[in-house]
């Protein structure tokens, strides 16, 4: 019976680890989305004397960025559309709320798993005391 309990505890631990990884990924995405919202919402980009544009592989080129015109936004399957800065900020704010909701669901799921782990562990500990 002890091996079954150990296997069950290991399985729950792996689920908790997976949830933690998903939460970490979503937290990083949330920071990136919030940074983009901040960048589009304030005038720092327009007033910055030097702008570097990533061209990949850690290389950057100096360039000019105009965010007063439409932004080009990916909508999936390699398709892009033009979108106003204001519309982009609205969409990003909605994305941010969706990410926060997903994080909350994962935190709830994690709590359930931790409770389940503690219950299994306590039950086994009680059996071993008897």
UniProtKB/Swiss-Prot annotation:
Its main location: cytoplasm. The keyword NAD does not apply. The keyword Cytoplasm applies. Keywords: Chaperone, Cytoplasm. GO terms for biological process: protein folding. Signal peptide: none annotated. Belongs to the prefoldin subunit alpha family. Molecular chaperone capable of stabilizing a range of proteins. Seems to fulfill an ATP-independent, HSP70-like function in archaeal de novo protein folding. This is Prefoldin subunit alpha. It comes from Thermoplasma acidophilum (strain ATCC 25905 / DSM 1728 / JCM 9062 / NBRC 15155 / AMRC-C165).
